[in-house]
């Protein structure tokens, strides 16, 4: 009998959500049943990421990153990285799991060696404003950092060189993402704009070059997240306007608008759409929003397939991994 049976890590689909109620919840994606709840003491959770080997999940919060075991029902974090001031807003992993990267409101992006017994960070990249988002280029050699001054930094990990661009002065960059083919980079900001660049270079010693492709006036309110689909054909943007919009990357036209706006005239806003993640086949998308719910949608029709209900406060981040390791 498999000792992992019944644990989150043994499920081919990992769906986790977290936010302001100090819990991380794990769900059966197809049924909407919550299978496990972990108490994340004394802190909201700003970002979640599953390790490449699907053995652990990282939860970034106030002054720490905590790693929870997916292959047991241990309620306590198995590793705790701390010693950072302020909120950690972003967390992710190198594709072979050797190191973790984070960004935070202390204006620093950090690299943490996961193989080291010493739980200190190995490298720091300092910028001049609080960091909202960090994303690792698919080449695994450049970190893209977005900050509250409106700057996007490209930190070359091989040479320690960096470049920056400012698509809109003094407008906070809230999310950056590169599609799996490394053809496009997208960034969204607090004015609701989505900027898209074509990517060239980024191989060998070449730093990635960004060629402006388009600017989409995606939302009339603050845009919070952008994500490309695994097949690179779609781009999703989430916003404070209660919508997640799906754009075709062939021409960046709007394909579907997923809305949590109420049809009742008397009902006020259900809150912000904070985060999203596509399924591996790019047919479905999960969203997290401040009405305490996560939802599974059909990308093509915009139909809600499942609601994940249980959080007591806003759901601001999620991790969705339905790729089965070979």
Curated annotation (Swiss-Prot):
Keywords of the record: Cytoplasm, Lysosome, Membrane, Repeat, WD repeat
Q: Name one GO biological process term.
A: TORC2 signaling
The record's subcellular locations are: Lysosome membrane; Cytoplasm
Origin superkingdom: Eukaryota
InterPro entries xrefs:
MLST8 (IPR037588), Quinoprotein_ADH-like_sf (IPR011047), WD40/YVTN_repeat-like_dom_sf (IPR015943), WD40_repeat_CS (IPR019775), WD40_rpt (IPR001680)
Keyword Cytoplasm attributed: yes
Q: Where, in residue numbers, are the WD repeats?
A: 1-37, 40-80, 83-122, 126-165, 168-207, 218-257, 268-309
User: Known SUPFAM superfamilies for this protein?
Assistant: Quinoprotein alcohol dehydrogenase-like
Indicate the principal place this protein occupies in or around the cell.
membrane
GO CC annotation terms, alphabetical:
cytoplasm; lysosomal membrane; TORC1 complex; TORC2 complex
Quaternary structure and partners? Part of the mechanistic target of rapamycin complex 1 (mTORC1) which contains MTOR, MLST8 and RPTOR. Component of the mechanistic target of rapamycin complex 2 (mTORC2), consisting in two heterotretramers composed of MTOR, MLST8, RICTOR and MAPKAP1/SIN1.
Family membership, please give it: Belongs to the WD repeat LST8 family.
Physiological role:
Subunit of both mTORC1 and mTORC2, which regulates cell growth and survival in response to nutrient and hormonal signals. mTORC1 is activated in response to growth factors or amino acids. In response to nutrients, mTORC1 is recruited to the lysosome membrane and promotes protein, lipid and nucleotide synthesis by phosphorylating several substrates, such as ribosomal protein S6 kinase (RPS6KB1 and RPS6KB2) and EIF4EBP1 (4E-BP1).
- Kindly provide the name given to this protein in its UniProt entry: Target of rapamycin complex subunit lst8
The organism's lineage?
Answer: Eukaryota, Metazoa, Chordata, Craniata, Vertebrata
């Amino acid at each position: 009998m498999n000792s992992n049976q019944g644990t989150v890590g043994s499920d081919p689909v990992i769906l986790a959500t977290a936010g302001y109620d100090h819990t991380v919840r794990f769900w059966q994606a197809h049924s909407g049943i919550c299978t496990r709840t972990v108490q994340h003491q004394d802190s909201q959770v700003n970002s979640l990421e599953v390790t490449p080997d699907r053995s652990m999940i990282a939860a970034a919060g106030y002054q720490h990153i905590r790693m929870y075991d997916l292959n047991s029902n241990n309620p306590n974090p198995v590793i705790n990285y701390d010693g950072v001031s302020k909120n950690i807003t972003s967390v992710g992993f190198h594709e072979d799991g050797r190191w973790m990267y984070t960004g935070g409101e202390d204006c620093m992006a950090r690299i943490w060696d996961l193989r080291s017994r010493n739980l200190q960070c190995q490298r720091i990249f300092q910028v001049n404003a609080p960091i909202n988002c960090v994303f690792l280029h698919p080449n695994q050699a450049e970190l893209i950092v977005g900050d509250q001054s409106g700057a996007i930094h490209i930190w070359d990990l091989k040479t320690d060189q960096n470049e920056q661009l400012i698509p809109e002065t003094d407008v906070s960059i809230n999310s950056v993402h590169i599609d799996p083919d490394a053809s496009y980079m997208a960034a969204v900001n607090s004015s609701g704009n989505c900027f898209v660049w074509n990517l060239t270079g980024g191989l060998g010693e070449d730093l990635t070059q960004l060629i402006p492709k388009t600017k989409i006036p995606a939302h009339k309110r603050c845009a919070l997240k952008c994500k490309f689909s695994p097949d690179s054909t779609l781009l999703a943007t989430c916003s404070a306007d209660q919508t997640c919009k799906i754009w075709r990357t062939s021409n960046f036209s709007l394909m579907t608008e997923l809305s949590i706006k109420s049809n009742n005239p008397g009902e006020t806003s259900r809150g912000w759409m904070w985060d999203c993640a596509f399924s591996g086949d790019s047919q479905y998308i999960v969203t997290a929003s401040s009405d305490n719910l996560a939802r599974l949608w059909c990308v093509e029709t915009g139909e809600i397939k499942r609601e994940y209900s249980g959080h007591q406060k806003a759901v601001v981040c999620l991790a969705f991994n339905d790729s089965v390791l070979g």
